[in-house]
């Protein structure tokens, strides 16, 4: 497989993998992030051209997120009968994505593995004991793999020397038009989910699983995202789109979890994961959006599939567990299969 490395600015690197079908994956040691995913020279994900732009404009785009993706209410959690206070995000009043700067702004070490059927970039970092208030020294590995059969695989591992919380994800945004100035409203979405987590006004889950049957968040039959944006569902109105955890009916790499199709039906992304839920966020940024590769990012200009345990699991056991025991290895895998259809 073809592999190139180049300078990404600010002391960071850009590593590009290209398979026999000309599917191109570019990743960086800035935040162990995906920067590009291209098929036939068409861009499939949002991103910037330099490390400096990520740092200045939006460090979460495409990045590895952790220690804990999403919000932890008031930055407080209890573990083994002890209460911990985490760093508070001033905008939300809660802990956001584990605290800032988090995984998204770390300079990760990396090695490259190249094989006949696939190539990988393996990023590693260590989050020290007490970072942003979390207990335990946590060693983290994020492995990005590109296969010859057009799968981008994300494998995340973690091991801590103390009991702690760990709920990582990847914050890639898809826009299959290749044009960040176009909204994703004409993309078609299917989800293997019949329940989601409603939110309070401050985007904290209220702690219940609500059935999606018959409402705007029901994607069990494929439909265009425009139908959601046009709906009057109160949860859609709350965030001006989608920014919610969806609980998967089935997990596993042999089970399709989600499917996103381009407006012209020529590109399809099939997603499989061993995670129990995914946070779907439709880039509800309003008019204040950055310029991205020469174009101003549209409101609703991308969509995330943040595979993880649902935020709030530290308080709501029905959501799952994000408790990582000392010495135990956490691992989660998500696969994105890129399918293209010619005229």
Model segments located where?
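An exposed, glycine/acidic-rich loop-and-rim segment of catalytic or binding clefts
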Residues: 1-343
């Amino acid at each position: 497989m073809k592999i190139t490395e180049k300078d990404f600015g600010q002391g960071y690197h850009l590593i590009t993998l290209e398979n026999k079908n000309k599917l191109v994956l570019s990743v960086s040691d800035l935040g162990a992030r995906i920067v590009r995913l291209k098929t036939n020279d068409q861009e499939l994900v949002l991103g910037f051209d330099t490390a400096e732009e990520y740092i200045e404009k939006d460090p979460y785009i495409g990045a590895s997120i952790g220690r804990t993706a999403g919000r932890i209410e008031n930055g407080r959690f209890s573990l083994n009968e002890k209460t911990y206070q985490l760093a508070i995000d001033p905008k939300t009043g809660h802990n956001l994505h584990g605290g800032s700067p988090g995984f998204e702004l770390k300079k990760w070490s990396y090695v490259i593995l190249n094989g006949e059927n696939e190539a990988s970039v393996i990023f590693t970092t260590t989050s020290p004991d007490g970072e942003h208030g979390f207990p335990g020294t946590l060693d983290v590995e994020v492995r990005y793999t590109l296969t010859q059969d057009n799968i981008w695989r994300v494998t995340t591992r973690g091991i801590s020397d103390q009991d702690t919380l760990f709920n990582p994800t990847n914050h890639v945004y898809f826009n299959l038009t290749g044009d960040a100035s176009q909204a994703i409203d004409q993309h078609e979405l299917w989800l293997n989910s019949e329940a989601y987590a409603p939110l309070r006004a401050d985007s904290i889950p209220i702690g219940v699983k609500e059935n999606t049957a018959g409402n705007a968040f029901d994607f069990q039959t494929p439909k265009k995202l425009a139908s959601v944006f046009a709906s009057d569902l109160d949860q859609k109105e709350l965030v001006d789109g989608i920014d919610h955890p969806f609980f998967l009916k089935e997990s596993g790499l042999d089970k399709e979890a989600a499917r996103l199709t381009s407006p012209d039906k020529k590109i399809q992304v099939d997603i499989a994961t061993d995670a129990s839920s995914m946070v779907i966020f439709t880039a509800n940024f309003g008019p204040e959006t950055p310029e991205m590769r020469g174009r101003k990012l549209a409101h609703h200009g991308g969509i995330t599939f943040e595979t993880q345990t649902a935020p709030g699991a530290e308080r709501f056991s029905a959501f799952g567990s994000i408790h990582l025991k000392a010495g135990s290895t956490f691992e989660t895998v998500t696969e994105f299969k890129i399918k293209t259809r010619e005229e």
